[in-house]
A protein has these predicted regions:
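Extracellular glycan-interacting surfaces
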Residues: 3-399
Length: 399
């Protein structure tokens, strides 16, 4: 014990004998650092306080578009040409956007929809023209546009919009417009008594002339198809998901989708707003010619019976599903046999919209946008397992 005390005393004496360097206060100085500020710098956005980010869309040249509503500007359409690292506001659009569609055959042509109108740009969003207004009476009588899609057909484009009517026992529909130099008017495709939450052209529309709609009769949800000039639900017959009414829906087509093969499947993500949704496989059979819906129960491994879905993306055997009521992402790498939650989610609180890059199977890169506090544009380079925020971050730094 005495030897230990002597050793400690010797050590302290040695330490005290060593002269201290000059006081830090005498030699060091604090320097102000310019932290990022809200809004744009040189036209490029970094922080976007108060912003919700939605409808992330990729043109065929890789250009990204989205809707956002930051407090620092009235502009709402954002564009990135560098994978989301920087964003500009082309066209100075100030509308409340409800959907964005890029023409698959032309990277410079995009469309966006409001609740009652559709707008078109052929120069990457720098200028827009207005298409004929109010398809199906949208903008009056509680009727509003719910989604938009577009495809090149011949020497022009065909535009499809879906509408809903929030009045009880009143319904929306699907309307087509031939966007050509001699433009006509919106044509009612007569889908019947349904509110339609999503409309999409088949990836092979120029061959199979198939349009798919996700609709509700205010009780159940239906996947409905129309081929050429035939009637809706005629071939194949509708798939019904009983007891579920959507507030929004998403469709994702596999790379190999081919309706004419007679056994084509696509994926449906349903957001009910009350957490009763999920991801479904919609499959067509040859005999009888009908759709069937299979609930994939993506949360079952975690004891979760249903998951509302805000975004859906597919590449090869990998499927990514973004949650509607959180920023979470579920992924399957084996064609929907098993599902895993991401280990680090995109920042934000809800409304996770997802895109995969065209060469996802090589790069394993995907993008996501979210809503709520700390919503942001995020990316993943490991197939959706972990996510990192990049830009348009909903955060206010106070100096």
């Amino acid at each position: 014990m005495i030897l230990s005390l002597l050793f400690i005393a010797t050590v302290f004496a040695a330490i005290n004998a060593v002269p201290y360097p000059a006081c830090a206060a005498d030699t060091l100085q604090w320097t102000a650092v310019n932290i990022p500020v809200e809004g744009s710098t040189g036209g490029l956005w970094k922080l976007a306080n108060g912003s919700d980010i939605r409808y992330l869309t990729m043109a065929n040249d890789g250009t990204l578009y989205c809707y956002a509503n930051p407090a620092g500007t009235t502009h709402t359409l954002f564009k990135s040409t560098d994978g989301g690292r920087s964003w500009t506001t082309p066209g100075k659009v100030t509308d409340v956007i409800i959907d964005i569609a890029a023409l698959p055959q032309d990277g410079a042509t995009i469309y966006y929809a409001t609740a009652s109108r559709v707008y078109k740009s052929e120069d990457g969003g720098n200028t827009f023209v207005t298409l004929p207004p109010s398809p199906g009476g949208a903008g009056s009588g509680n009727v509003s546009i719910s989604s938009i899609d577009v495809v090149r057909v011949g020497d022009g484009n065909t535009v499809a919009v879906s509408t809903i009517d929030t009045d009880a026992a009143q319904f929306g529909g699907v309307y087509l417009l031939e966007d050509r130099p001699l433009m006509g008017t919106w044509v009612n495709t007569a889908i019947g008594n349904y509110d339609v939450y999503r409309v999409a052209f088949s990836p092979n529309y120029n061959v199979d002339r198939q349009i798919i709609a996700i609709a509700s009769n205010e009780v159940d949800t239906f996947a409905i198809s129309k081929i050429y000039n035939g009637c809706w639900g005629q071939n194949p017959a509708n798939a019904c998901i009983g007891g579920i009414m959507p507030s929004a829906a998403n469709i994702a087509f596999p790379n190999s989708y081919n309706y004419l093969s007679g056994a084509a499947s696509f994926f449906l993500g349903i957001d009910t707003g009350v957490n009763k949704g999920d991801v479904y496989t919609i499959s067509s059979t040859i005999i009888p010619t009908a759709y069937t819906a299979t609930d994939l129960h993506i949360g079952s491994a975690y004891g979760i019976n249903a998951v509302d879905i805000a975004g859906l993306a597919i590449s090869g055997s990998t499927i990514l599903a973004g949650c509607a009521d959180s920023a979470g992402v579920y992924l399957s790498n084996d064609g929907c046999i098993s599902w895993t939650q991401c280990t680090r989610a995109p920042t934000g609180q809800s409304g996770t919209c997802i895109l995969t890059v065209p060469d996802f199977n090589t790069q394993h890169k995907a993008y996501a946008v979210t809503r709520g506090q700390e919503s942001a544009f995020s990316y993943s380079n490991d197939g959706g397992l972990t996510w990192n925020q990049v830009r348009t971050i909903d955060f206010l730094l106070v100096q």
